[in-house]
Amino acid sequence: MPPKTRSTARRSGRRVVKKNVAQGHAYIKSTFNNTIVSITDPSGAVIAWASSGHVGFKGSRKSTPFAAQLAAENAARKAMDHGMKKVDVFVKGPGSGRETAIRSLQAAGLEVTSISDVTPQPFNGCRPPKRRRV
């Protein structure tokens, strides 16, 4: 029986396809613990994303405005590689990185055409968590 030859190793995972999208949406989800920035094309397919944890912050440093700034810059840079120029910004959540993330999207070179707050407001839904005693 002939010896088995090994085939070349194959990479698993998706192949990155360079899209040429000029306009899209930027979704900034800013919670008390983290900030996540997703940039999509007009149909909603994600082109680039970044978060405070993805950029390299851990623990309580993820919730800082500086971490949100770096995450937004990182996502904007990736989106501009795909040809993105203009974005509509949708902000969700009560976190501290909201305004900083919007400013850093503009500073990175993306033209912000509109900003809207899409934070969900309950009509007296779930009971909120108990007050912290420090």
Curated annotation (Swiss-Prot):
It holds the Pfam family Ribosomal_S11. The keyword Cell membrane does not apply. Keywords: Ribonucleoprotein, Ribosomal protein, RNA-binding, rRNA-binding. One of its GO terms (biological process) is translation. One of its GO terms (cellular component) is ribonucleoprotein complex. It comes from the Bacteria. Gene3D superfamilies: Ribosomal protein S11 (3.30.420.80). One of its GO terms (molecular function) is rRNA binding. InterPro entries: Ribosomal_uS11, Ribosomal_uS11_bac-type, Ribosomal_uS11_CS, Ribosomal_uS11_sf. Part of the 30S ribosomal subunit. Interacts with proteins S7 and S18. Binds to IF-3. Located on the platform of the 30S subunit, it bridges several disparate RNA helices of the 16S rRNA. Forms part of the Shine-Dalgarno cleft in the 70S ribosome. NCBIfam families: PRK05309.1, uS11_bact. Belongs to the universal ribosomal protein uS11 family. This is Small ribosomal subunit protein uS11.
